[in-house]
Amino acid sequence: MLSRSSGYKRAFLRRTVLETRKDMMSEQVSVSKSNIRGAFGAFFIPGMYTALWAGFVPYLKAKLSIGEDVLGSMILLLGVGSCLSMAIAGKLVESFGCKRVVLLASFIGMLSLAIVTMCSTIVTTTIALFFFGIGVGLSGASANLQAILTEKVSKKHLMGAYHGGWSLGGFAGAGVLLVLLKILSLPVNESIWGLLIILFIAMIAISQFMLTFGRDPNAKVMKKSKSPLSFHPIAIIFGLLSFVSYLVEGAVGDWSALYLFEDKGIVIQEAVMGVMLFNGTMCIGRLLGNTIGKHVTSKQVVVGGYLLGAIAMALIVFLPGHASMYTYLLLGISLAMVVPNLFSAMGEQNVIPMTQAVATSTMLGYMGILMGP
């Protein structure tokens, strides 16, 4: 029995290595439209299920009868889970292939979110949120590695559109949840469960078109590192720049619905519109970003985006009611192309392995989520 198990393991590893070598030989690999769409799905579907979490936050707070301090501590552990999973995401992708990690991440994230909706105590909800964070972190890191690989093989600039897929998923998820809750008056738990089942089935189908990723091609000419992370200045700089953008995106995802409901007087069924508008304009900006990028530099995109974002956040605080809610449109468009520009640059540099660059930068970036609560 042990011999048979070892044989299965060797066969699995051999198949993974062969698939990896095939995909990483860029001269022999052709990227079809289906492959490009598969990578897009790795962003779109996680964007959708994370938007469902954003819409559920006010209901969770009311169900558990907790204050913002307790809720903030619970969301803090969500961020911890994300950071921990991102730290090992690169090694998991190298060992098992990006497609398998994408599926694993979706399963963990969606199952954990379903459990969150069923929990009735602070302890169980916090544990479920920790695992939800693990799923979200793995989803983000593995999706970005899939996108970088697809860009390298196809030699096309796709990162803006891929990150637009996450925002489009967030817009769609918030929009569908809004329809189910406000127009159809369906229960929130059942609405989220039904959507999660559909999304996971869709992810299984779409994953069949993803490229298999195993190792950074730079590893052939560089000393192999056993560490999943890199503390090279390049990775640190990328991480710190990502930190600011993730801080804002995390705050909008976790707090915007509750903020609009409690501080701006928006009815609870409409409170999810803040994240919907934010994701909608961010999606448009990212889908059009590759065209805009031909006329401006990456530095101008990053600096200009952060300045405009600061103005938008100030307006959200000081404007009343629906005016504050609609300002999320400006916030979304201002930050749209900041992170895509950073990840494209990670794929283009040849100083450190791609998996280390992405794992380190995304982990440091998601520290922004830890700082938000």
Positions of PLM-derived features:
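C-terminal ends and interior cores of transmembrane alpha-helices
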Residues: 107-120, 308-319
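Conserved MFS/SLC helix-loop-helix module at the cytosolic interface between two early adjacent transmembrane helices
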Residues: 86-116, 123
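Helix-to-loop junctions at the C-terminal end of transmembrane segments
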Residues: 85-97, 181, 285-297
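C-terminal transmembrane helical hairpin of 12-TM major facilitator-type secondary transporters
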Residues: 299-342
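Cytoplasmic helix-loop-helix junction between adjacent transmembrane helices
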Residues: 132-164
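Symmetry-related core transmembrane helices of the 12-TM Major Facilitator Superfamily/SLC fold
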Residues: 190-208
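Short amphipathic helix-loop junctions that connect adjacent transmembrane helices
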Residues: 55-69, 254-270
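Helix-breaking motifs and short loop linkers at transmembrane-helix boundaries and internal kinks
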Residues: 65, 97, 118-123, 318-320
